[in-house]
Amino acid sequence: MDITELLAFSAKQGASDLHLSAGLPPMIRVDGDVRRINLPALDHKQVHALIYDIMNDKQRKDFEEFLETDFSFEVPGVARFRVNAFNQNRGSGAVFRTIPSKVLSMEDLGMGEIFKKVSDVPRGLVLVTGPTGSGKSTTLAAMLDYINSNKYHHILTVEDPIEFVHESKKCLVNQREVHRDTHGFSEALRSALREDPDIILVGEMRDLETIRLALTAAETGHLVFGTLHTTSAAKTIDRVVDVFPAEEKSMVRSMLSESLQAVISQTLLKKIGGGRVAAHEIMIGTPAIRNLIREDKVAQMYSAIQTGGALGMETLDACLKRLVSKGLVSRESAREKAKTPENF
């Protein structure tokens, strides 16, 4: 069994991930649940060979030196995969996250008009947040695709690794992969400001320097899209501010209050009848929200989102209620994800 056959099988089953782990049969995650493939267990040598076959020399060297590595891999005609190779107590392991080869449009994903409005802003910071595997990359890809289809701009992305590949439609699109095309997010962002971009996508805002540079880029007239692993708008603001030392916090609040255009926090739910659907909390950078950020009154943000429906804002619970009433998700699924489960 070679790796391309396993990956083709995984993609055909609609799996989000393929897991290889020495001592166990291959497994796939379908609609959120991990299931075994009906194959014999793989030993360390087999897993090691499967992973090594698709690595280049640099990736092998990284894997040997750091005991884990990330890279992307494409099976032509099937899909691209984001790969993490690692070691565990029984030997080698790897996870292949499926990246659909086709960028889904906002229409495909059933995203509302507010996502177009957010994508149309000329400058500022847009954060798409949520836990790992909540579909952030898919949402961002749809937003970039909308810009790419409607505007004559330069889109520059910095990703680790590149997930969705965007063809240049009306826009010029340049995608840079960390460790392959640049040494890191902060290095790429520093030079991005000299590369005449209109839109910058920062795959992950992991550290102080990257967040600082993203804020600067947003302040200097670029539209910056970024991701964080936070689960709500309020937590997102806190997370960004908390990265900075005490003496800079008020300056960062001021920068955020000027440049933040939207925070979209999302989670994935199982759909009735199979598949998954995203639920969002949407906060827009209105004057009221900007004031709350500047004055460090993040706790009041939730009620501002609740009352901001006319401006396109929506709480997660309101979005979940809509999905339940449309018959897309069950009450039980909604209750699991809700901020106030007793409402379901």
Positions of predicted regions on the chain:
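Short, flexible helix-loop junctions that flank or precede catalytic/ligand sites
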Residues: M1-F344
